[in-house]
């Protein structure tokens, strides 16, 4: 099965078969969208919450808000229906201890913005594994819409399928 790897501040979409994956989700978030009927899906690996807050600099996929809009547009182009899409959300970890500043709680903010934007777009969030301190790797199976998540927390490897 072909695997497409998504880097930080990037996304990929596909249809039918294959795996779309992203590695090393720390404070970043990985958002998957999937239409079970057409078997169209996509994955976004966003670094920061809102483009406007950073002066819309650079690639829109770097930000949760603009990246999600981009991902939505691309899965619809491949045949997905916005009304059937299901979202899954991963990442948003607090990677450093002793951070008190709200400004530096990027992981938490990424998760909040992702949930807000999904609500605004009318897309159902059906699964999530967010927060904590460990990094995550996720694999979206385009034939089923299932996401296999692997994380390391306190030296333990945890794998789950969502």
From Swiss-Prot:
Task performed by this protein: Probably deamidates glutamine residues to glutamate on methyl-accepting chemotaxis receptors (MCPs), playing an important role in chemotaxis.
SUPFAM superfamilies, alphabetized: CNF1/YfiH-like putative cysteine hydrolases
InterPro entries the UniProt entry points to: CheD-like_sf, Chemorcpt_Glu_NH3ase_CheD, Cytotoxic_necrot_fac-like_cat
Listed PANTHER family: CHEMORECEPTOR GLUTAMINE DEAMIDASE CHED-RELATED (PTHR35147:SF1)
Name this protein carries in UniProt: Probable chemoreceptor glutamine deamidase CheD
EC number(s) per entry: 3.5.1.44
Record organism: Pyrococcus horikoshii (strain ATCC 700860 / DSM 12428 / JCM 9974 / NBRC 100139 / OT-3)
GO biological process, one term: chemotaxis
């Amino acid at each position: 099965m072909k695997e497409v790897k998504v880097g930080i501040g990037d996304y990929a979409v596909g249809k039918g078969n294959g795996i779309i994956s992203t590695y090393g989700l720390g404070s970043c978030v990985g958002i998957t969208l999937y239409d079970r009927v057409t078997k169209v899906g996509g994955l976004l690996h966003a670094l920061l919450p809102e483009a406007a807050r950073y002066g819309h600099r650079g690639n829109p996929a770097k930000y949760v808000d603009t990246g999600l809009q981009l991902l939505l547009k691309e899965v619809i182009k491949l045949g997905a229906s916005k009304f059937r899409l299901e979202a899954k959300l991963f990442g948003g970890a607090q990677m450093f201890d002793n951070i008190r500043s709200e400004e530096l709680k990027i992981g938490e903010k990424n998760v909040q913005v992702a949930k807000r934007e999904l609500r605004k777009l009318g897309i159902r969030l059906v699964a999530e594994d967010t927060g904590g301190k460990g990094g995550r790797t996720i694999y979206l199976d385009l034939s089923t819409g299932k996401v296999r998540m692997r994380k390391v927390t306190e030296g333990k490897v945890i794998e789950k399928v969502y």
